Every structure is written in structure tokens, then in C-alpha cells.
Amino acid sequence: MRCVPVFVILLLLIASAPTVDAQLKTKDDMPLASFHANVKRTLQILRDKRFCCRTQEVCCEAIKNG
């Protein structure tokens, strides 16, 4: 029963410790904003493709080819 307060204090100290990034950045790391922009662009292309293919078959072929 005497260990419980010590355990609680240790948990509080661990939870309040500052977090540190364990991995150092390399020159190959890309910023998160760039990653989000790529995802956004890809989703936009897929949305356009889906809408276009529903309305016109010719448009769908044009998107597939380039």
C-alpha cells in the first residue's frame, strides 16, 4: 500500500515530461505541409476523374491517357 503514492507520483512525472523527437531529420525528410498538398492534389484528381467518367466517356479516356 505504501508503493501506490510513489507509483502515482512517477506516473505524473512521466506524463509531464517534455517530448523529444527520437529521430533526427535527414535531408530526405519532406515537410508535412508538402505531404498534405500531395494528398490533396491526388484526391482532387480522383474526384475529377470520378465525376468526369460519370458524365462523359470521352473525358474518362482523356484522363486515363494523360
Swiss-Prot record:
Residues 20-48 form a propeptide. The keyword Signal applies. Expressed by the venom duct. The modification Asparagine amide is found at residue 65. Keywords: Amidation, Cleavage on pair of basic residues, Disulfide bond, Gamma-carboxyglutamic acid, Secreted, Signal, Toxin. Coiled coil: none annotated. Its main location: secreted. Residues 1-19 form the signal peptide. It is found in: Secreted. Contains 2 disulfide bonds that can be either 'C1-C3, C2-C4' or 'C1-C4, C2-C3', since these disulfide connectivities have been observed for conotoxins with cysteine framework V (for examples, see AC P0DQQ7 and AC P81755). Pfam families: Chi-conotoxin (PF16981). GO terms for molecular function: toxin activity. The modification 4-carboxyglutamate is found at residues 57, 61. GO terms for cellular component: extracellular region. Belongs to the conotoxin T superfamily. The cysteine framework is V (CC-CC). This is Conotoxin mr5.2. It comes from Conus marmoreus (Marble cone).
